[in-house]
Amino acid sequence: MMTDARTTAEGGMETSYGFHKVDEGKKQGLVNEVFHKVAKRYDIMNDVMSAGLHRLWKDAMVSALSPRKDPSYKILDVAGGTGDVAFRIIEASNRLAHATVLDINGSMLAVGEERAAKKKLSDNLTFVEANAEELPFEANTFDAYTVAFGIRNVPRIDVALKEAYRVLKRGGRLLVLEFSEVDMPLLDRVYDAWSFNAIPQFGKMITGDAEPYQYLVESIRKFPNQEDFATMIRTAGFSRVTYTNYTGGIAALHSGWKL
């Protein structure tokens, strides 16, 4: 068992499986198992974990991106297997842009591909099973890189951010939406009580298994706070790094540019 203190810009997430310390190299397999279990109920899980607010936060993320209405505009949505963010981006582009949805988990991608077909968005989307730490793309390929509620599950976040920088075109934008550190004294206590007591129990009711939800709640607490994560983005090479808190810091949208 490790401390519940947040990791920092110096690292630590690579050996943190929630509040449990694991050998470096083992975390990815453990995280994969979590998402194989929750794939078909992933968006319901996000509703439980955010009281439905993740939908508003994702809409705000897409508004901040303001994707070009242009067939040449290319987005890479990482850890986006179910397509929830990519669908929003394509719709915001009047179904003109193209999004590559990358996820390391095949179960999540299967859900996304099925949904894309039902929404008649398959022509605008490519689904790729790959690791965010080793992107299978050439440098300077994408206009935008997005990731929503997925970066904290990547073992080596610093490596993933450097890969994001590599595959973005000059002038390209990084947007990362992630649960973060609540900055309102009363809200932080309420949110902690909800997270550690209610969410695993709701997860058990929905899926019959509380363990994946326990990990996800603990991983939120371990993730670097807003300032530390902004530092990590700058260290990866990004410029004009900013963040916007949503709902008192329950979530934050970080932005950076490859200039």
Curated annotation (Swiss-Prot):
UniProt xrefs under Pfam families: Ubie_methyltran
Catalyses which reaction(s): a 2-demethylmenaquinol + S-adenosyl-L-methionine = a menaquinol + S-adenosyl-L-homocysteine + H(+); a 2-methoxy-6-(all-trans-polyprenyl)benzene-1,4-diol + S-adenosyl-L-methionine = a 5-methoxy-2-methyl-3-(all-trans-polyprenyl)benzene-1,4-diol + S-adenosyl-L-homocysteine + H(+)
Annotated metabolic or biological route of this protein: Quinol/quinone metabolism; menaquinone biosynthesis; menaquinol from 1,4-dihydroxy-2-naphthoate: step 2/2; Cofactor biosynthesis; ubiquinone biosynthesis
Recorded superkingdom: Bacteria
Residues bound to S-adenosyl-L-methionine: 82, 103, 131-132
Record-level GO BP terms: aerobic respiration; menaquinone biosynthetic process; methylation
UniProt keyword annotations, A-Z: Menaquinone biosynthesis, Methyltransferase, S-adenosyl-L-methionine, Transferase, Ubiquinone biosynthesis
SUPFAM superfamilies for this protein: S-adenosyl-L-methionine-dependent methyltransferases (SSF53335)
One MF annotation (Gene Ontology) recorded for this entry: 2-methoxy-6-polyprenyl-1,4-benzoquinol methyltransferase activity
Enzyme Commission code: 2.1.1.163, 2.1.1.201
Role this protein plays: Methyltransferase required for the conversion of demethylmenaquinol (DMKH2) to menaquinol (MKH2) and the conversion of 2-polyprenyl-6-methoxy-1,4-benzoquinol (DDMQH2) to 2-polyprenyl-3-methyl-6-methoxy-1,4-benzoquinol (DMQH2).
Stated family: Belongs to the class I-like SAM-binding methyltransferase superfamily. MenG/UbiE family.
Protein name, as recorded: Ubiquinone/menaquinone biosynthesis C-methyltransferase UbiE
Species: Agrobacterium fabrum (strain C58 / ATCC 33970)
